[in-house]
Each structure stands twice: as structure tokens, then as C-alpha cells.
């Protein structure tokens, strides 16, 4: 039986502010700047006008209302009883947009058949009914043009998912990261035959799962042709294009425009940190490697930060690495790029980790940016607290370059390594160009594209 028209208790517009999530680093930076600002001015000048107290009260009220709405939704209820009768706990504009019927969402391309900008501001629920299974049917007043007499249906599971979190989860929770050093890196579990990787979705899921967990895998028995790395990278996502091209050669050349194209030692670094969004995954496919030297080295920066968290001194340096920006740049061969980044980047969303001595300290760890060879050489006014930052980087670098942290291997022809470029640093020992040949082929994949592949394969991975 159809229920009467319902009202909606409108949240204050300021409620949108309560959903803005800041990383711990952003919060700490703002707190510090405010603290310095307060010290520099007379106390009387920092007294805020009463409007801020009113704003805070509205924020608290809106947050409480939103929490109550989520509780109602999580119970499978779209409407609650209010002073004036049934009240929809979701704004009617948002509820109208949530309709996924074939008239609203194209079944083939999964895109909207209308523009959300055309939803009338005065749209409202006209009638609603709920069947025995808890599913809702809703009709509308002042609906979109061309959608007269439209009926939207929402399943009970759909309604419950809206209350589960602010952003509904479409895949199973992500597996925990596994932190490693020289002694704990799971080499056997991180090595996969090429044909297993490209031969089936199950094989690909195993590689993607391990790459997510450890940030470093090896693919063996690959064809030794120049196009093989393109095919391999495409299993993870579209190739990331940079000024080096979709793929590039890593071998010693005269007059090199990048230290990677020399025979010299190349210390621990990450690639393209001077770009707006650096590639998160890098592939290096070995086509030839008969030179003396040229061993590849890898280290897990997350594990290094775990070791830093073991002492008060390390914790202090860790905080500095979160707060202080470092400038990276590339100005060569007609290219001009620069970017400022704190060494350690945090996320507002917790991420569990294994093989960590201090998991609580790392629960919000997101990315690390470390690339000393590609730092910007000129002084910058962003280099605040330069002595504290340098001391913190000394501390981090000492642990990073310790024998305990380093996994070393000499790539052989037909082997490809794939690693998380924003977690795992890589280095290369010097090699003798007169003793043989060394030729690697490289490619990148963006983090968002890899995450899409991960989500599509999640059901084939361990829970």
C-alpha cells in the first residue's frame, strides 16, 4: 500500500564540511602553522568572533544528524517517523540520483541517461511502499523532464549499504601490506612464471595480490623481445606515458640525459617524483645482462619507517618527514618539471600491515617519496626547518642503506621485476661496459589503473 507524501529534514549546507577528510600530515601542518602564527601576534588579535562558535555548533549538529541517518539506513530503513510523519533520511536529490534502473542508467555503458544538473531543486518523494522483503518503490513529485510517472526501486541491501559507510565499498576489504627486509622478503612467493601470469585470470590475480602486499614481484621465463614488457604491463593496466615514451631502454649511452642511462652507480630512488602524479608501478624487463656488476637492489621504505618508529628519536624524525616538503625537479633536454612533496604521505583511511613491529604507527601510511638524485638543486623558500629535515633524512637514509634493508639480485635475461614506485626504492650497482652487455626495457602503470585491475580480480584473491 502506497504511503503518503513524505518530508525531508534538510541538513544545513555547512554539513558538507564535516565530510572533508584531511591526512594526519595536513592536520599537523595546519596546527603547527596556526601555533606559530599565534606566537607571532598579540593574544588579543587571535580572539575569534562569535560566528565561529555558531559554525562549530552547526557542524556538530549536522554530524549528529548524518550519523543518525546512517544508523537508520544500516538497518535497511529509508524512512523514519518524524514530527510531521514519515521522513526520508536521504535528501531527495541524492535519492533520485541513486536510481539505477535502465531508464536512468544505460545497461550497456553504465552511464547516466540524464544530467544530474537537470534534477529540479524542488524534487520530492511523492509516495513510497515497502514489500515483505524490505525493498522500496518510490514515486516522485517534480521529477526530471521526461520522467513523469517514473518509479524508482531500491533493494534492502542497497539501502543498508548506504548506511555502512560514507562511501559504499564495491569490493572486499584490501589485504594487509606485508612489510619486509633482507631476511623476511618472501622471494619464492613473489616469483611467478610469465605464462602463469598472462595465461589466466587466476594467475594474474596471484601476481596482483602479491604485488599489492609486498610491492615487489619477479616474473620469469619471459620472451626476450622488445615488445614483451608492453604486453606484461597491459595485464596491470594501460601504460603510463611520460616524456620517455610508453616504454624506454635502460642501457649505457654516450652523453646520457639520465644517470640511469650510464654505467655509474645509481643509489636508491623513485622515478618521476617531479611529475604531478608519478607512476605508482614500474616494470624493468631484462633483455641482456652479461656485464660484470649491474646488480639491482630494492628496499621497502615502509619497513624502514617501522624501524624508525622503534625509538623516540626515530618517531621525531618520522614526524619531520611527514611535515617538511622536499623539492624535486628535472630540467634537461628541453624538459622542465618541478614538484614539492613531503617524504612521507599519510591517508585518512587506515590500512593494516603485517610483519610490522609498530603497526599502529603505520596504520595510515600511504606513500613515500624518496629520490635524492632528482632533487631540485636551487634554494627554495619551501625548505622550512632545513636542519631538522636534513637530520631526519640522514636518519632515514642510514636505515634505508643498511645491509639489513636491502634485497639484491642480478636480473637475468627473460626476468622482469615489477615494483611499487611509491613504496619500494630501487638502485643499481655500477657495471663494466667492456665486459658484456646490459639492456633493460622499462614501463610504468598508474596507481589508479592498477587499483582498477586489483578490484576486478579481488574475488579471485585470498580473503
Regions found by a protein language model. Give the residues of each.
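Motif-centric detector for short Cys/His coordination patterns
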Residues: 2-197
Amino acid at each position: 500500500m502506497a504511503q503518503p507524501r513524505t518530508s525531508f529534514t534538510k541538513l544545513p549546507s555547512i554539513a558538507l564540511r564535516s565530510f572533508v577528510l584531511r591526512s594526519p600530515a595536513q592536520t599537523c601542518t595546519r596546527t603547527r602553522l596556526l601555533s606559530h602564527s599565534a606566537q607571532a601576534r598579540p593574544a588579543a588579535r587571535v580572539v575569534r568572533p562569535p560566528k565561529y562558535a555558531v559554525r562549530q555548533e552547526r557542524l556538530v549538529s549536522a554530524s549528529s544528524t548524518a550519523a543518525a541517518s546512517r544508523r537508520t539506513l544500516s538497518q535497511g530503513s529509508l524512512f523514519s517517523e518524524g514530527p510531521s510523519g514519515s521522513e526520508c533520511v536521504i535528501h531527495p536529490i541524492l535519492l533520485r540520483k541513486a536510481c539505477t534502473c535502465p531508464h536512468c542508467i544505460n545497461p550497456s555503458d553504465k552511464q547516466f541517461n540524464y544530467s544530474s544538473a537537470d534534477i529540479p531543486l524542488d524534487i520530492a518523494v511523492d509516495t513510497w511502499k515497502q514489500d515483505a522483503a524490505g525493498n522500496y518503490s518510490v514515486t516522485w513529485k517534480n521529477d526530471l523532464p521526461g520522467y513523469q510517472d517514473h518509479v524508482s526501486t531500491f533493494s534492502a541491501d542497497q539501502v543498508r549499504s548506504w548506511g555502512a559507510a560514507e562511501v559504499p565499498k564495491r569490493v572486499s576489504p584490501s589485504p594487509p601490506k606485508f612489510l619486509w627486509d633482507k631476511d623476511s622478503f618472501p622471494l619464492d612467493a613473489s616469483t611467478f612464471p610469465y605464462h602463469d601470469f598472462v595465461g589466466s585470470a587466476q594467475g594474474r590475480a596471484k601476481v596482483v595480490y602479491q604485488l599489492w602486499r609486498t610491492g615487489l614481484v619477479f616474473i620469469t621465463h619471459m620472451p626476450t623481445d622488445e615488445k614483451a614488457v608492453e604486453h606484461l604491463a597491459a595485464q596491470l593496466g594501460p601504460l603510463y606515458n611520460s616524456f620517455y615514451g610508453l616504454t624506454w631502454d635502460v642501457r649505457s649511452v654516450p652523453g646520457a640525459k639520465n644517470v640511469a642511462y650510464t654505467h655509474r652507480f645509481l643509489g636508491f630512488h623513485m622515478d618521476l617524483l617531479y611529475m604531478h602524479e608519478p607512476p605508482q608501478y614500474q616494470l624493468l624487463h631484462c633483455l641482456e645482462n652479461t656485464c660484470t656488476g649491474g646488480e639491482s637492489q630494492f628496499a621497502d621504505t615502509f619497513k624502514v619507517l617501522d624501524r624508525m618508529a622503534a625509538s623516540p628519536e626515530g618517531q621525531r624524525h618520522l614526524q619531520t618527514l611527514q611535515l617538511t616538503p622536499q623539492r624535486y625537479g628535472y630540467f634537461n633536454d628541453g624538459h622542465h618539471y618541478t614538484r614539492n612533496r613531503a617524504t612521507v604521505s599519510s591517508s585518512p583511511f587506515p590500512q593494516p600491515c603485517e610483519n610490522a613491529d609498530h603497526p599502529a604507527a603505520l596504520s595510515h601510511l600511504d606513500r613515500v617519496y624518496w629520490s635524492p638524485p632528482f632533487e631540485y638543486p636551487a634554494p627554495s623558500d619551501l625548505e622550512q626547518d632545513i636542519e631538522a629535515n636534513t637530520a631526519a633524512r640522514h636518519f632515514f637514509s642510514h636505515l634505508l642503506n643498511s645491509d639489513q634493508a636491502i634485497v639484491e639480485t642480478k636480473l637475468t635475461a627473460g626476468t622482469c621485476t615489477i615494483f611499487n614506485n611509491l613504496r619500494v626504492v630501487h638502485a643499481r650497482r655500477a657495471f663494466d661496459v667492456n665486459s658484456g652487455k646490459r639492456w633493460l626495457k622499462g614501463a610504468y602503470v598508474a596507481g589508479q589503473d592498477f587499483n582498477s585491475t586489483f578490484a576486478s580480480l579481488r574475488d579471485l584473491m585470498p580473503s
